[in-house]
Amino acid sequence: MKIGHQFHTVALVGRSNTPGIAEPLASLAACIAKRGFEVVFEADTAQAIGSAGYPALTPAEIGARADVAVVLGGDGTMLGMGRQLAPYKTPLIGINHGRLGFITDIPASDMREVVPMMLAGSYEREERTLLEARIVRNGEPIYHALAFNDVVVNRSGFSGMAELRVSVDGRFMYNQRSDGLIVATPTGSTAYALSSQGPILHPQLQGIVLVPIAPHALSNRPIVLPDDSKIAIQIIGGRDVNVNFDMQSFTALELNDTIEVRRSKHTVPFLHPVGYSYYATLRKKLHWNEHPSSEEDDDA
């Protein structure tokens, strides 16, 4: 068993527009408070579920006051809160109340048993990297964003292919005609990048992956770069090209705009139950080894 820091103030975050989430959040809050922890709620979550009796805080206030944030929702909720809390190094615990649950790894049915043990110090910790990106137009930055999973440059559904000029560390890599290009973290390698035939990167691998989306030339393949690489993607052709960050914020691009992407100085601590295995997550979520030869193999 790995014993870590015991927490005092716990922030609860939920996907506020999800039907049926109020009861499990209230139940978890009561369970945690009964064990002597101070419980606060993220403000939008508190408003949506009517969490009377608990302080309601903005993400910035959570970062300044809470020792840990427990997120009940899907991967998107976890990504959004991770980006907002990244500057504060607030650890995150993810409870899956969505569909896939790659990064919300605790089943909701187990939360009342597992979460209190983790808050008492029984957990495994890992750091997840983020990307920071900026859009440069006519030599001036016009937009900045963080991305937990990926930065995606792509065409709209009704326009032709995008033409992109890609450079790494100031050196020309290639011109590419495609539906777009994904720049992904190891965490994001199991998201959109995976569906575009990109490789899976272990979360502790120091890398950034570039994955073309439906490239015109079959020789345009994914490539893994060192995570200190500085990537520049210039729009040199195409109509209605845009860029999105974790599929949660979007910006329209113009000809000759450049998207500059690099690893963020921020990392986000993820906390897992003792015995957590990334390989078990892959096996379960991607349906690997559906007919294991033994129970021992299945539990590894």
From Swiss-Prot:
GO cellular component: a single term: cytoplasm
GO annotation terms (biological process): NAD metabolic process; NADP biosynthetic process
Location of the active site: D75
Matches recorded under InterPro entries: ATP-NAD_kinase_N, ATP-NAD_kinase_PpnK-typ_C, NAD/diacylglycerol_kinase_sf, NADK
Family label: Belongs to the NAD kinase family.
Location (main, coarse): cytoplasm
Native organism: Burkholderia pseudomallei (strain K96243)
Catalytic activity: NAD(+) + ATP = ADP + NADP(+) + H(+)
Role: Involved in the regulation of the intracellular balance of NAD and NADP, and is a key enzyme in the biosynthesis of NADP. Catalyzes specifically the phosphorylation on 2'-hydroxyl of the adenosine moiety of NAD to yield NADP.
Name recorded for this polypeptide: NAD kinase
